Regions:
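Conserved helicase RecA-like core
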Residues: 1-235
């Protein structure tokens, strides 16, 4: 395929595989940022993870992807080393990895916790040597022409969740149960509208049904969590 066609192919790959959590690997951070801008212009919500981000930004990015607030994470190999995220159902190698060990590490993201998934590698005629190396190592690879990809135009690439930030965490003795109670018994939110709760030392992140975000921001800002008011906003 042509390099210029890679970006426009990604929505088709996602919809064809009905993917909800997509990890895209690029070899360089400049490619990550360019691809993120291009996909955003196509109407997709994306996050990036590379070495230009400070550790706090990396941690927050991982939280927002792992709690399903954003469906797509674009990452470099260095930044994603040691990354533990379950339920990734599609890995796309936008750039082919530089060796088979990195390739193994990438595609293994879809098999965590005994779960399956799909890994797709995009390549051009300039990648011939790397393609042959990967084929020699992974004998069960199936090659497919881009013309055979069946795009499901009815599939919506989006997340049902968004995340709220609370400026209090473990150092303020906050626990997941405290936040859950403030949202359910406190402001009347249903448990099914609340997703993953991540509590760090000085901050907490809560995935919320995006249809309820405005309500939660308004009501929780006026309510106490474990006897104290906290600053709350959407990430």
């Amino acid at each position: 395929m042509e390099e210029s066609n890679k970006t426009t192919l990604i929505p088709a790959l996602i919809s064809a595989n009905k993917a909800k959590s997509i990890l895209i690997f690029c070899n360089m951070k400049i490619t990550c940022d360019k691809l993120a801008d291009d996909l955003y212009n196509l109407g997709l919500d994306v996050l990036t993870l590379h070495s230009d981000l400070e550790q706090k930004q990396r941690d927050e990015t991982i939280i927002l992807f792992s709690n399903k607030s954003y469906p797509i994470l674009i990452a470099t190999d260095v930044a994603s080393r040691g990354l533990h995220i379950d339920d990734v159902d599609l890995v796309i190698n936008y750039d082919l990895s530089l060796d088979e060990k990195i390739h193994t590490h990438r595609i293994g993201r879809t098999a965590r916790a005994g779960k399956g998934g799909m890994a797709i590698s995009l390549y051009t005629h300039n990648d011939y040597d790397r393609v042959e190396l990967i084929k020699d190592t992974f004998t069960d690879i199936q090659e497919e022409s881009v013309d055979k990809i069946e795009d499901d135009l009815s599939y919506k690439i989006d997340s049902e969740l968004r995340t709220i930030f609370i400026n209090g965490g473990k150092k303020q003795k906050l626990r997941a149960g405290d936040i859950l109670g403030a949202m359910t018994a406190g402001i009347g939110l249903k448990k099914e509208d609340i997703g993953k709760i991540d509590i760090l030392d000085f901050a907490s992140y809560v995935a919320i049904n995006k249809e309820k975000i405005a309500y939660v921001l308004t009501e929780l800002s006026k309510s106490k969590i474990k006897g104290k008011y906290y600053r709350i906003y959407e990430k």
